[in-house]
Amino acid sequence: MADLKKTPLYGEHVAAGAKMVEFGGWLMPVQYSSIIEEHQRVRNCAGLFDVSHMGEITIKGPDALALVQKLLTNDADRATGDRVIYSPMCYPDGGVVDDLLVYPRGEGEYLLVVNAGNIDKDFAWIQENASGFRVEVSNISAATAQLALQGPRALEILRPLTRVDLASLGYYRWTEGQVLGVHCLISRTGYTGEDGFELYFEAAAAPTMWRNILAAGREAGLVPAGLGARDTLRLEAALPLYGHELGPDISPLEAGLHRFVRLEKGEFNGREALAAQREAGVRRQLVGLTMIDRGIPRPEYPVLAAGKEIGYVTSGSLAPTLGQNIALALVAAGTVSTGGEVEVSIRGRVNRARVVKLPFYRRPKK
């Protein structure tokens, strides 16, 4: 594990007794108490995640918008003012380089937040595509920490720690301001299916911020949460994970991300391939499964219909909120329908599952 990267909060995690695991080249906390307990705390109260392993790349210059438009399938013209956008970033053949968040940082500047295991690849890809554009591309990941405060009590916990009017900050909106005396980019975003905030700030401040936010939220029930709970939370919300629901061989259309593919915006990497897919129809589709028989479906387990293999599980787990075993699966288009039954081969045994509408979980409206 000596070659694995560590976030600025590594010492905090070890001191708290977290179980550390390898993830995308990083040594990260998978859990502190238990995955189920941390999961339920986020659903019912709040959890604080160290997501400093995520990457941050800036694009600055007169041609910044033009380059971002070339890179993204979504329309970067929609990332204006305080609006954050989510987008896949594709290869010319329609496969996915990565999926990311985009923050407009003023005239001619964008912040791209990329997945931890893809930082170097994404940075090289963006630099390659920047040839001929009047831009400066910088990888600021090592200098940037990121915390995610997630759950229905996130606003209640964070509001006393800043003068920023967080209550009026809409979902997928961002602002800047001081939190506990540290300058932060504050974003009302997350990867759990719950309300919450993601904070970006200088890496040196991470240990103090971590300790002080946890202390401030303790009476409200805030706990540190690891990557295990983050994964079960995002799976219940049917949020894709790169390398599972997205990848070089899985297009955004196959993954069900149609609304983030804006063919009408003009040329971008992968547009021709994705336009052809949309016209002809995708060969595969992402579906949700709840297990009828016992057994937890795991990635790459075969999915069958009438005894014939039609696809495979991309992600699967016990869903603590639902008390069921669930999965996302990539299957041949047109072979299943919502409410129908399929089978998952789990260690050579056939287990029945039902095709369900996604997401598995949607947070209650207030």
UniProtKB/Swiss-Prot annotation:
GO MF, one annotated term: transaminase activity
Subunit structure: The glycine cleavage system is composed of four proteins: P, T, L and H.
Gene3D superfamilies in alphabetical order: Aminomethyltransferase beta-barrel domains (3.30.70.1400), Aminomethyltransferase fragment (4.10.1250.10), Probable tRNA modification gtpase trme, domain 1 (3.30.1360.120)
UniProt source species: Moorella thermoacetica (strain ATCC 39073 / JCM 9320)
Catalytic activity: N(6)-[(R)-S(8)-aminomethyldihydrolipoyl]-L-lysyl-[protein] + (6S)-5,6,7,8-tetrahydrofolate = N(6)-[(R)-dihydrolipoyl]-L-lysyl-[protein] + (6R)-5,10-methylene-5,6,7,8-tetrahydrofolate + NH4(+)
Family of the protein in this entry: Belongs to the GcvT family.
Name listed for the protein in its UniProt record: Aminomethyltransferase
Gene Ontology CC annotations of this record: cytosol; glycine cleavage complex
Statement: the UniProt record of this protein carries the keyword Transferase: yes
EC number per UniProt: 2.1.2.10
The entry's keywords: Aminotransferase, Transferase
Transmembrane portions of the chain: none
Gene: gcvT
Entry function: The glycine cleavage system catalyzes the degradation of glycine.
Pfam families referenced in this protein's UniProt entry, alphabetically: GCV_T, GCV_T_C
GO BP: glycine decarboxylation via glycine cleavage system
